[in-house]
């Protein structure tokens, strides 16, 4: 939790803006609270209020917000859909979520996963070009398996895709932070590898804690 604040809190709040001045939770605290759901073995946003709050609230300095606050923040950060009308007359809605996508990139720079001064291509193209080659199924299937089972993508919290887009980007940021921490951690001491999935991480850390007790 402290590493999250040290590496990302300033970046999050400067990009998304201050959510409150006197009372309430900043967006960095809300994202950290959501991160705790998955680093503690939870599977959905509601787990933080149902199972984790009584433990996380014992931290002497860092505050943890409720599931309702996380869900309100998702609504606050939701952007309107853009509608594109094709030449055939069909309309398509898409959501750019510019601020959250910008945060995702800035967070990667803050953790050192992207390097300042380097060139990166973030362009996304919907054009489909038919080829005779197979797609990289192991790559994207592994990613979706990881996000579905480790970071809540199989239990989206909202009914509308615009709101769920914010959640998907929030958890993508958390996943990137987890990857950054695993690169810094002495993983062998916990029976882990830098590429270990988050569920394996949670199990091994709890196992080591039991052995210490």
Write out the residue ranges for each language-model feature.
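Structural beta-strand/beta-sheet cores of well-ordered domains, especially the beta-sheet scaffolds
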Residues: 118-122, 149, 164-171, 201-203, ...
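General structural signal for alpha-helix termini and helix-helix connectors
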Residues: 54-58, 153, 183
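A short, flexible helix-boundary coil/loop motif
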Residues: 177-213
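Short runs of predominantly hydrophobic/aromatic residues within well-ordered alpha helices
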Residues: 27-34, 45, 166, 170, ...
